[in-house]
């Protein structure tokens, strides 16, 4: 796994310079982007420089920096929010396509995650244990408020959701799959005869294949087939 570590607090670094550094590293598209809050350990060089750099740190482990001459306490808390959003919506790998389009639309990766963290705070969503589906619901609400309505983020979110696993519970914004129940049945019956899309399913009949794969209709009427045996999601 390619991991890029971006330390939060270096001498003379303010929030604007960190903003630029974040965007530069984000453009590299690492698999993991780790934001690290530097610590002031007892007996360390950083402890010796506390007065010079205006460091205020936690008095108990993990001894993280809370304020510097260049970063206020409020800005450190703000960066904590960005760190949390990066962990949930980037490092988890569960929202790759949706976030890619959002960042392209936003034009500034740091600003997007910063705004998303502010949204969590405004909506009272912090300090709550959210399951995976709830994270999709929250991101959809955020997009409804701030995103481009011309881009089908509903499709992107559903694609990201099903690409990972064949979920049984669907988010509230997802259409009812019974709307294309007949098309799904016909597709798998045809696939059982023609063996056109699902490679390696030769030993399975149409009903078994329907449980092992998923057919999703997009907003434009096209279909995407999710092949979980081979870990593929593609237009059918």
Explain the meaning of each model-derived region.
Residues 84-234:
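Radical SAM enzyme core and accessory elements
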Residues 2-4, 231-236:
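Residue-level detector of conserved catalytic or cofactor/ligand-binding positions
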Residues 1-114:
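A structural motif corresponding to the C-terminal lobe/cap of the Radical SAM core domain
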């Amino acid at each position: 796994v390619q991991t890029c570590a971006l330390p939060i607090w270096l001498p003379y670094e303010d929030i604007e310079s960190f903003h630029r550094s974040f965007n530069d590293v984000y453009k590299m598209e690492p698999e993991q982007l780790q934001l690290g809050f530097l610590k002031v350990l007892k007996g360390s060089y950083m402890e010796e420089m506390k007065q010079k750099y205006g460091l205020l740190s936690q008095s108990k482990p993990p001894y993280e920096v809370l304020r510097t001459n260049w970063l206020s306490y409020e800005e450190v808390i703000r960066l904590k929010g960005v760190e949390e959003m990066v962990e949930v919506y980037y490092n988890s790998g569960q929202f790759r396509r949706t976030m890619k389009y959002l960042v392209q639309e936003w034009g500034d990766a740091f600003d997007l995650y910063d705004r998303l963290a502010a949204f969590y705070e405004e909506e009272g969503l912090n300090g709550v244990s959210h399951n995976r589906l709830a994270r999709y619901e929250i991101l959809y609400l955020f997009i409804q408020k701030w995103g481009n309505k011309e881009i089908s983020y509903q499709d992107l979110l559903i694609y990201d959701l099903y690409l990972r696993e064949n979920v049984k519970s669907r988010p509230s914004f997802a259409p009812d799959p019974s709307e294309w129940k007949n098309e799904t049945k016909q597709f798998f019956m045809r696939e059982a005869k023609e063996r056109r899309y699902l490679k390696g399913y030769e030993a399975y009949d149409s009903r078994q294949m329907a449980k092992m794969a998923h057919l999703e209709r997009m907003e434009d009427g096209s279909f995407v087939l999710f092949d979980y045996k081979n870990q593929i999601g593609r237009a059918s």
